[in-house]
A protein has these predicted regions:
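Sec-dependent bacterial lipoprotein signal peptides
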Residues: 1-19
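Intrinsically disordered, low-complexity segments enriched in small/polar residues
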Residues: 20-31, 35-157
Length: 157
């Protein structure tokens, strides 16, 4: 596990140093006749002044031979239509009305330098509402949610 994290960290540093600006996002679409609720659960981190709330992807601080580094991710929501975002107890909850969709992108911040990255892990993804589907841009991966509600783990790189 530690080796995997170290490899991911080294790849991330190399990509950040090369000026990686590739935005990764996914779209949640509501194909049902009733609203759906999407919730992301993270460990909240103190928000910096003038910035969006931060949520931990991995333990906030990890010691490595290269020194201390932070795994932090800032979630940015781009609603297509109206969406209600509720941030409570480390949860970002989005309620979508029928025929609406939500685009969510993520950004990493490392050593004070923000860089779009290619790897993220959503620790918990909860969707409520039959007929919801998840399209992942760029990866050609589609997950269909046919149950009324459930908890899913999503990983992509």
């Amino acid at each position: 596990m530690h080796n995997r994290l170290l490899i991911a960290f080294l790849i991330f540093v190399a990509a950040a140093g090369a000026g990686c600006t590739s935005e990764r996002s996914f779209v949640i679409k509501n194909g049902s006749a009733s609203p759906i609720v999407v919730a992301y659960q993270f460990a909240p981190l103190p928000a910096k002044e003038g910035s969006a709330p931060m949520y931990a992807m991995h333990p906030p601080e990890t010691e490595s031979p290269e020194g201390r580094w932070n795994w932090e991710t800032r979630w940015i929501a781009f609603p297509e239509g109206q969406a209600t975002v509720d941030r409570q107890q480390g949860t970002v909850r989005v309620t979508l009305d029928p025929a609406q969709s939500l685009r969510v992108a993520h950004a990493f911040e490392y050593a004070g330098q923000e860089s779009w990255d290619f790897q993220v892990r959503i620790t918990r993804l909860t969707m409520t509402g039959a007929g919801a589907q998840l399209d992942m841009a760029g990866d050609q991966v589609r997950l269909a949610f046919v149950e009324s509600d459930g908890v899913y783990v999503l990983e992509y790189r």
